[in-house]
């Protein structure tokens, strides 16, 4: 590649990678291009990222088993998605960095700060052990998301999301869920 400055990462795929097509059509039409983009990026030494709203469990499996993708998000929970963070961590957390999956409406928009902290801690319990996890919302936060809920998410990370030298999150045990 002819880049003088390398980006931090390359986003491949897109917001609705699997929403508007079947897995078979994705494999036939999109996966070859996504794989090639990932190969090029990895060969130049930078990370790759897929953001795909909606049902994503099958996409996570494909990306983990058939590509060298670095990170995938937003790992939305039902009803908008189909992801179970603990299951994805167990199956693919050694291969992919998982990013998500705080519910943007039920928790961030309509929840209380305590709801946000509880959801953040649960996500860290489900996905954080051993690293390769980025706590994030399931997608963007709506315009009317209360500032105190955004601050609560930051608080949860600072208070409970600090790894020790063994890749553990020891502060999580202090939070009763």
List each language-model region with its residue ranges.
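Active-site loop segments of alpha/beta catalytic cores
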Residues: 1-177
